[in-house]
Amino acid sequence: MEDGKPVWAPHPTDGFQMGNIVDIGPDSLTIEPLNQKGKTFLALINQVFPAEEDSKKDVEDNCSLMYLNEATLLHNIKVRYSKDRIYTYVANILIAVNPYFDIPKIYSSEAIKSYQGKSLGTRPPHVFAIADKAFRDMKVLKMSQSIIVSGESGAGKTENTKFVLRYLTESYGTGQDIDDRIVEANPLLEAFGNAKTVRNNNSSRFGKFVEIHFNEKSSVVGGFVSHYLLEKSRICVQGKEERNYHIFYRLCAGASEDIREKLHLSSPDNFRYLNRGCTRYFANKETDKQILQNRKSPEYLKAGSMKDPLLDDHGDFIRMCTAMKKIGLDDEEKLDLFRVVAGVLHLGNIDFEEAGSTSGGCNLKNKSAQSLEYCAELLGLDQDDLRVSLTTRVMLTTAGGTKGTVIKVPLKVEQANNARDALAKTVYSHLFDHVVNRVNQCFPFETSSYFIGVLDIAGFEYFEHNSFEQFCINYCNEKLQQFFNERILKEEQELYQKEGLGVNEVHYVDNQDCIDLIEAKLVGILDILDEENRLPQPSDQHFTSAVHQKHKDHFRLTIPRKSKLAVHRNIRDDEGFIIRHFAGAVCYETTQFVEKNNDALHMSLESLICESRDKFIRELFESSTNNNKDTKQKAGKLSFISVGNKFKTQLNLLLDKLRSTGASFIRCIKPNLKMTSHHFEGAQILSQLQCSGMVSVLDLMQGGYPSRASFHELYNMYKKYMPDKLARLDPRLFCKALFKALGLNENDYKFGLTKVFFRPGKFAEFDQIMKSDPDHLAELVKRVNHWLTCSRWKKVQWCSLSVIKLKNKIKYRAEACIKMQKTIRMWLCKRRHKPRIDGLVKVGTLKKRLDKFNEVVSVLKDGKPEMNKQIKNLEISIDTLMAKIKSTMMTQEQIQKEYDALVKSSEELLSALQKKKQQEEEAERLRRIQEEMEKERKRREEDEKRRRKEEEERRMKLEMEAKRKQEEEERKKREDDEKRIQAEVEAQLARQKEEESQQQAVLEQERRDRELALRIAQSEAELISDEAQADLALRRSLDSYPVSKNDGTRPKMTPEQMAKEMSEFLSRGPAVLATKAAAGTKKYDLSKWKYAELRDTINTSCDIELLAACREEFHRRLKVYHAWKSKNKKRNTETEQRAPKSVTDYDFAPFLNNSPQQNPAAQIPARQREIEMNRQQRFFRIPFIRPADQYKDPQSKKKGWWYAHFDGPWIARQMELHPDKPPILLVAGKDDMEMCELNLEETGLTRKRGAEILPRQFEEIWERCGGIQYLQNAIESRQARPTYATAMLQSLLK
């Protein structure tokens, strides 16, 4: 198969594996892996892709691959990753794989300089290239730009963001302190906003949009940082393998003894807010020695430091202090920040116990007195006031008058703990807001022309336990994915369609329904949550039940017990829900959703903190107090500030800003879950590529044009440098002249209605045209003028040459016309005078016989004069007849009559002479004359036979044409009957198609859900749920798997088995099921037969019905296989033709989609039709114009001929005759892969006028081209299938 060419087939852990096709199934291909010879497996045909010929080759832009598909995309990234080339393009989108180690010199100052002003594609892929492209686009298009850095947690978004900022400030900064401040702001923001998670050691727990502002000279003048959704819950609690924000550990590890004493710090294990997670520091050998022993936790002393090339708590503390100094923070302000951080730690160490009195409430534990003292000291609070505010809540009643009565309500231990944590989260979040504001103050700007914004926000998150923070993060990623779909897929395709470029449509999954589920007015999850917060007694259970009730049948929402992970099935329906996101299904536990959605403190704590003695603390809360001063607290009730609504508003403002800018995308990829270098997990990387839309982009860029410019925009850019004669040009014509002057290849660009578009990888040419440097523009105008002058002279030369050619052609045609006239006149004259000429020839022959008569007479002894007289009379009669024929227009019958009379006279004379000769001589002479007459008679008979044969052939051709017309009439009559039935069927087919597309979307979502569950299972050491707990759709598809004898449940599976199981589940798609259902109605079920078995049965079976069924299935598989080859052909190559396009186009389209949507009422049963016409032999000939010549000048087209011999409904022999290459001969059996796979009815040949030819015409060409020898060799090698042709040849050979 495929001449041994390798293909990519699905693999559960590597994504794809290379193999060879060894068999073609009904809806699948049998693959033999290259590394496991002798072993085979089945793969769905639409999941198999052709592989590059050189498996070790890599390309910088995936659009340069010979085959553009997800398998070659993954393999190219893998090959480049193995060579430490972590960056790859898909057109103008950058794919960045996290290497998890430092690659030397890749981000050096020399590297920065090498990318300055360079077009995309002229240097190896790099994040610097994207940054420089954004800058050049901003400068040329006079439009602000955005760079969206996206990817999963741990994929390298934060680092790539820092490299973009560093590149812009180093390359296009003013050389002042402001450039350093923008770069140095990152360590400070990371210290307060980043933390270690399970999947990332330096995970950003907030989103930021960093704007670098430029003046009219395109120099950096300032910056601004917007931040979104700090994860406040992390301040109070973390997972076992996670840490709190870096600042806490860096302060403990790196603070001087003086600061440490002032802040009363110790090792991390002594603080509640740190010791429930990981208490180890990040350090290397040198910094480990610099950290004092009393600052190390027992866990650290036991297991040692954690290693990361980018993190070092002791060294990072020093770097953070340096950054603070560079951005303008003095020592006092620096100490203020540290003081609040330490105050939060001490606040967390305050514990409560139940009070002994009957009034209820709680008291501080004795051991917490020290922590209370430290906390009050650091935050500028009174100890007693802090104690009272944490253990009681002030309520204001209105029953006692206008001013009301103040009542202190004691809090229970749990309520006091919640109040303490709420205060800690509020203080830290206000501190973070202050840090961001302070960062923004360090690079102010008065005026700004444009900006480049870099978005770094938490990637899609899916843990074993997901809460409100993950819900908001994933909601944000849904919105960003929709923006990506709109900008790259939707808007691009709409533009292509509007401009008339004819690019094939690319389908993608629209996630609008998921976004509506979350943010829709009144019924969206965020609004339901806000409504719950406003209730007198809100609860998470009531909120969850309301979500399920209002979205009972929503496709994107389901209950936890339908999760693929067993751990989620223990969650009750009112404790969580599952949302099917674009990247997969995530189960959210709604505990604390209501609490986390409220950003307000109760009145006691808010009053306490706002009245702090410390000026810095008061300043932290002043802005918040001013913003919320209109919010009045009702008696006994907390005020409500919605976190979700605030985030939604911020997110919508961000997206509005992104939509108003030009966008560049950096897709960060996480190579493995262990966060180790040089380890490539193909399956989970493939999932990231699919979820990020890279596969859809690759499909679009096969025919896409990522760069474009308006004709008028280009024209106006060059107009002021044009001379008058150029200024009069039409903008479109000017652009055409400009491209010609630059020598651009016509395949690299395409003209739309109002814009010119450039192919992927042609960014250098595009930038050359768009470069707005005055000298450069003037130079290009000169080149355009030069090209126009040259082209006009060439036109003059061409016109002169054309006139000469035209003169010669007229002369040639005149001579040809004379020659045609001469020939026709000769033919007419010949047809008119041929009977007379033939008569003269015959009579002349008779006259020649007189010499023999004279010889006979000369030997006679008696009666010579009389005989001479008779001979003389006969000669006179002959001469008279010849003269008469020459002078008069005699018919053939008249000539024949008189000729016969002369013959009779000559015969009578001859018999008289014979009497006078001796018996022997007379007998001998008579015999000779009779022989000559017999020859003449035979010749006349042969002429008559030839004439009858020609008339018979003309009659047969007329009968064939009449038969074709009769078949055409019958077909039209049948079509009229079918139209009536088809009208009823079309509505049903439309419904079926809609249901099928919906089912396909569900299957695709199920696949993503299962892949995501598999990745969670691998990272969390969990197992996918067993069959007894699977959802209904999955149970139905897996009931054929073995069941354990002990407990009746399925055995636990490895990840590879789980992935294989999912692949088999997906193979039960609607198209496959429809095919199998159709096969079930037939007498023979051939769906499990191998391709070779079908072929052998066709060659050997005598069962006519089985033979017909096998032939039908055999050719159906050929159609599917050839459709797969056509879909996955090489880029920029024509589809190989097994028959002329007019034949294959007639019935090829349905197989490209692999969907059996043909009208069942419009088909005659193929088997019945084959039995009826089984022994019919029909021959056809039609023109064969090659694809390369399709759009050439008609006179220069190279037209060949395509011959076909159909034995019944299927092709038996095929010939291709081309003027510039040897004939191509094909016979059934030996050359099935190269021959036309359609049956006679599907080709439409019987309905093509003049296509059918006589058997003799086919056989003559077949024999002349060596077909007999070719077929004989195929028969001898047992490769030819038994057909009428093979039987006839074998009988001739015998």
From Swiss-Prot:
<dbReference type="GO" id="GO:0005905">
    <property type="term" value="C:clathrin-coated pit"/>
</dbReference>
<dbReference type="GO" id="GO:0016461">
    <property type="term" value="C:unconventional myosin complex"/>
</dbReference>
<feature type="domain" description="Myosin N-terminal SH3-like">
    <location>
        <begin position="2"/>
        <end position="53"/>
    </location>
</feature>
<keyword id="KW-0963">Cytoplasm</keyword>
<dbReference type="GO" id="GO:0015629">
    <property type="term" value="C:actin cytoskeleton"/>
</dbReference>
<dbReference type="GO" id="GO:0042802">
    <property type="term" value="F:identical protein binding"/>
</dbReference>
<dbReference type="GO" id="GO:0051015">
    <property type="term" value="F:actin filament binding"/>
</dbReference>
<keyword id="KW-0597">Phosphoprotein</keyword>
<dbReference type="GO" id="GO:0007605">
    <property type="term" value="P:sensory perception of sound"/>
</dbReference>
<dbReference type="InterPro" id="IPR036961">
    <property type="entry name" value="Kinesin_motor_dom_sf"/>
</dbReference>
<feature type="modified residue" description="Phosphoserine">
    <location>
        <position position="267"/>
    </location>
</feature>
<protein>
    <recommendedName>
        <fullName>Unconventional myosin-VI</fullName>
    </recommendedName>
</protein>
<dbReference type="GO" id="GO:0031965">
    <property type="term" value="C:nuclear membrane"/>
</dbReference>
<keyword id="KW-0333">Golgi apparatus</keyword>
<keyword id="KW-0225">Disease variant</keyword>
<feature type="region of interest" description="Responsible for slow ATPase activity">
    <location>
        <begin position="273"/>
        <end position="317"/>
    </location>
</feature>
<feature type="modified residue" description="Phosphothreonine">
    <location>
        <position position="405"/>
    </location>
</feature>
<keyword id="KW-0539">Nucleus</keyword>
<dbReference type="GO" id="GO:0030330">
    <property type="term" value="P:DNA damage response, signal transduction by p53 class mediator"/>
</dbReference>
<dbReference type="GO" id="GO:0048471">
    <property type="term" value="C:perinuclear region of cytoplasm"/>
</dbReference>
<keyword id="KW-0966">Cell projection</keyword>
<dbReference type="GO" id="GO:0043531">
    <property type="term" value="F:ADP binding"/>
</dbReference>
<keyword id="KW-0472">Membrane</keyword>
<dbReference type="InterPro" id="IPR008989">
    <property type="entry name" value="Myosin_S1_N"/>
</dbReference>
<dbReference type="GO" id="GO:0006897">
    <property type="term" value="P:endocytosis"/>
</dbReference>
<dbReference type="InterPro" id="IPR049016">
    <property type="entry name" value="MYO6_lever"/>
</dbReference>
<dbReference type="GO" id="GO:0005654">
    <property type="term" value="C:nucleoplasm"/>
</dbReference>
<dbReference type="GO" id="GO:0005794">
    <property type="term" value="C:Golgi apparatus"/>
</dbReference>
<feature type="region of interest" description="Interaction with OPTN">
    <location>
        <begin position="1116"/>
        <end position="1118"/>
    </location>
</feature>
<dbReference type="GO" id="GO:0005776">
    <property type="term" value="C:autophagosome"/>
</dbReference>
<dbReference type="GO" id="GO:0070062">
    <property type="term" value="C:extracellular exosome"/>
</dbReference>
<dbReference type="GO" id="GO:0008104">
    <property type="term" value="P:protein localization"/>
</dbReference>
<keyword id="KW-0968">Cytoplasmic vesicle</keyword>
<feature type="region of interest" description="Actin-binding">
    <location>
        <begin position="665"/>
        <end position="672"/>
    </location>
</feature>
<keyword id="KW-0813">Transport</keyword>
<feature type="region of interest" description="Required for binding calmodulin">
    <location>
        <begin position="782"/>
        <end position="810"/>
    </location>
</feature>
<dbReference type="GO" id="GO:0005886">
    <property type="term" value="C:plasma membrane"/>
</dbReference>
<dbReference type="GO" id="GO:0005884">
    <property type="term" value="C:actin filament"/>
</dbReference>
<feature type="modified residue" description="Phosphoserine">
    <location>
        <position position="604"/>
    </location>
</feature>
<dbReference type="GO" id="GO:0005768">
    <property type="term" value="C:endosome"/>
</dbReference>
<dbReference type="GO" id="GO:0005938">
    <property type="term" value="C:cell cortex"/>
</dbReference>
<dbReference type="GO" id="GO:0016020">
    <property type="term" value="C:membrane"/>
</dbReference>
